[in-house]
Amino acid sequence: MEPIVDFKILPERLRQAAQVVTVAVASPADSHTEEVIERSIAEQFARFILVANAAKADIARRLAADYPDKVTLIVAEDDDDAARHAVKEVREGRADVLMKGSLNTDNLLRAVLNKEEGILIKGSVLTHIAVADVPSLNHLLFFTDAAVIPYPTTEQFDALARYITATYRSITGGDRPRVALIHCTEKVSEKFPLTLSYEELKANAANGAYGEVEIGGPMDVKTACDAESGAIKGIASPVVGNAFPDIEAGNTFYKTLTLFGGATVAGMLVGTSAPVVVTSRADTADSKFYSLATACLKAINK
């Protein structure tokens, strides 16, 4: 089967998997979430457990009535209660993916990270992986971390490398990801401590820590993604995945891709027992739909 190179292929690939993914949605009370749910049902790859805040349950009630075979409704007291119940559905094995609705991200993360009742895997690092469908590229672009870890340690970078290579394989079907370690400089120097962490990642990769993988860096984004720029500098490493030095660089790249690059960007949290879809309120319905689709594919191809 050919690797997935753009988002349009995702729904068909999910149908081919012949496995309907169950998604627990915390507080589905906005029009974008409503659209994503109906579109996913129409594409025949997901069913839903909607955990609605009693004060704003109209959309959830309507969806449960319209799709009785695809939607289960649970009514919670408030957003915090909705988050706890949605996480419980995942923790107890009734749902494969967790999705944020119209509640604040903090409400959901409190439930996800709860030491007794959450779904963060013990000893794991919670991080965000984004996947971009960029018109100028002939493959999907994966990058991390744009949302969770402000300044990753060497140990956290190691976790990010493991997560992003595994996520690339589970979503695209490709077997040899190419990873660029992004920085403003292309030289390893004590003046830039992060470049020293990158050297450790490359050593880990050489020892097989991330499976079959090509890894290079430090390098800037243009060198990483544009073969001509790399050739001019004598660096042959255009890639499908990027690891950013900190959250500021990753988040800026995320927003720039959508605003100026015409990209559609999907994203999920990993390090948990199931993928967690946490999109921004400003994200488009397309972005939210493909975030769910990529999370569902990751859940199937664990």
Task: Report the location of each language-model feature.
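Anion-binding alpha/beta catalytic cores of soluble intermediary-metabolism enzymes, centered on
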Residues: 1-302
